[in-house]
């Protein structure tokens, strides 16, 4: 902090009240540190790094396309697509419909088809049914990590038809 004796290194651009840095009536005690929950992650094998789900809608069905990546236990900064290497890692996908029906896809699926899906609609237009997606990562057939999210099956379109003033978008 060039030119200031009352600021700590790294706190030059922090948004705090000036008095917290000791120039006024208080001590030189900027409130900094851990202020949200902290989690320590331990593992004996790799873990799921990310799951990307892309939806493809057709008449009477929705196909979910999965892209699952994992972190190896040796280097958590590295990301490896699951199923692209013969390293013993596979994943299984279970989708639970709003009515409780389960659809299971094993052996590192890239796609999963939902027949007669219940679509998610904006508030006031229809219902908002959610599907629970569970991805289980396994090493040599033994589960090592699980990822769970709830998703809505929906499409979005932009109405660009001309009206009396021009196009709406």
What are these regions (language model features)?
Residues 1-169:
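Secreted/periplasmic carbohydrate-active enzymes, especially glycoside hydrolases
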